[in-house]
């Protein structure tokens, strides 16, 4: 897929404005809050600071494409643990959590905290976020 945009355009704006993928949110614009997290080749990446030119030939996954089979295991765990409040940070949090579980199937609390450190939640649901990640990890282990 290609879009007509300058190479220095942040990926976030291409996703939202050119492709209509509005699940990825704008939070701070400087890569500090995590609301714009997407996956580039499976790695959690801040779309607001990633120029379009850095995505050439790479696989981009947004919250809309996280699972081809309905809700992703992390999304189901999010609901089960009642994580969302306002929901604004949710897509970025889920994308970071999914990337963590892809590389660390059974993370410790410390690994979760480290991976999620760059994702801010104004509602302060950090304990539920951690619980949801543990639930998703356990669910993934049970279904293997």
PLM regions and their residue ranges:
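Signature of N-terminal electron-transfer/Fe-S-associated modules in redox systems
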Residues: 1-144
């Amino acid at each position: 897929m290609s879009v007509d945009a300058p190479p220095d355009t942040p990926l976030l704006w291409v996703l939202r404005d050119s492709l209509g993928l509005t699940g990825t949110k704008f939070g701070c614009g400087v890569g500090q809050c995590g609301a714009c997290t997407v996956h580039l080749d499976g790695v959690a990446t801040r779309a607001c600071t990633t120029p379009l030119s850095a995505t050439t030939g790479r696989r981009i996954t947004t919250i809309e494409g996280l699972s081809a089979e309905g809700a992703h295991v992390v999304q189901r765990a999010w609901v089960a643990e009642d994580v969302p409040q306002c929901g604004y940070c949710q897509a970025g949090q889920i994308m970071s959590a999914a990337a963590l579980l892809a590389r660390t199937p059974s993370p410790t609390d410390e690994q979760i905290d480290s991976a999620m450190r760059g994702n801010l939640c104004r509602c302060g649901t950090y304990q539920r976020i951690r619980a949801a990640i543990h639930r998703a990890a356990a669910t993934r282990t049970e279904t293997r």
